[in-house]
Design a protein with these regions (language model features):
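Start-of-domain marker
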Residues: 8-69
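Beta-strand-rich domain onsets/edges
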Residues: 9-20, 91, 96-153, 158-166, ...
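Short amphipathic beta-strand segments in non-cytosolic proteins
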Residues: 43-51, 168-186
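Glycine-centered loop-to-beta-strand initiation motif
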Residues: 62-66, 180-200
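Residue-level recognition of secondary-structure-to-loop junctions
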Residues: 71-73, 196
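Exposed beta-strand face motif in extracellular beta-rich ectodomains
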Residues: 75-79, 200-204
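Short acidic/polar inter-strand loop motif in beta-rich domains
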Residues: 83-92, 210-216
Length: 229
């Protein structure tokens, strides 16, 4: 492992409710409103890894912001959600601008498309030891739902079904969703061990910056969530 950097950008996860799941967006356990129209996909995987597109209910509360929600009684083993976070510019004054590509922005350091995604394990199946076919994924190398507080979960990061290059990949080494994480830059995409928090919701948080050219990049923020007893 190399240096660390603060988790500044928000992450995404599926939060169980009495009727299904809310797609939550925030940090340290607090939830912020977002534009639900940016939620592109929510999929359900059964025990045989067969997928179903789940109908997304989008609620707008104020200033185009709200949340996305699913109602489901299906016995899914895994849920996956994806949000298109649109185009961003980072400028020399350390400000971020969420405006369309080609906008008249001065003093650009980096610019590019941003995506957020999350996988939630409802019921453990062996196929979850491998990528499920999404763009970026955190893959557990054992059943994480059987772990206890203080145990370590070994994971690997994937992009396009292949091991992600360690360069520009970061991950939080603790699965507690209610604390301010440090994201650790990886030296290698092997032996990544995440410390399990107290029983309940666990959130493994990772980010990856894929270079396009000298200034253009694609940012990926992706999580793996599950519950422990």
């Amino acid at each position: 492992m190399l240096t660390s950097s603060k988790l500044l950008a928000h992450s995404m996860w599926l939060e169980k409710t009495g009727y299904g799941y809310d797609l939550s967006y925030g940090e340290k356990g607090s939830v912020d409103l977002y534009n639900p129209e940016r939620v592109s996909t929510i999929l359900g995987y059964n025990s045989k890894k067969e997928t179903t597109d789940i109908h997304i209910l989008r609620y707008t509360l104020e200033d185009k912001k709200g949340l996305a929600r699913i109602y489901t009684k299906e016995n899914y083993s895994l849920l996956y959600a994806e949000l298109d976070n649109k185009y961003w510019f980072n400028t020399k004054d350390e400000k971020w601008h969420n405006v369309p590509a080609g906008s008249d922005i001065k003093n650009i350091v980096e610019e590019g498309q941003s995506y957020k995604s999350t996988k939630h394990i409802v019921k453990w199946e062996k196929y979850m030891l491998n990528p499920i076919g999404q763009k970026v994924e955190i893959v557990p190398l054992q059943n994480p739902t059987s772990l206890k507080e203080g145990d370590f979960l070994e994971v690997q990061l994937y992009i396009d079904g292949k091991l992600m290059p360690a360069k520009e990949a970061r991950i939080a080494m603790n699965s507690n969703p209610y604390i301010d994480h440090e994201l650790t830059y990886l030296e290698t995409n092997k032996n990544i061990k995440i410390k399990i928090s107290k029983s309940g919701l666990q959130l493994v948080n990772a980010k990856y910056k894929q270079k396009v050219d000298d200034k253009k990049v694609v940012w990926y923020s992706f999580t793996l969530t599950f519950n422990t007893k």
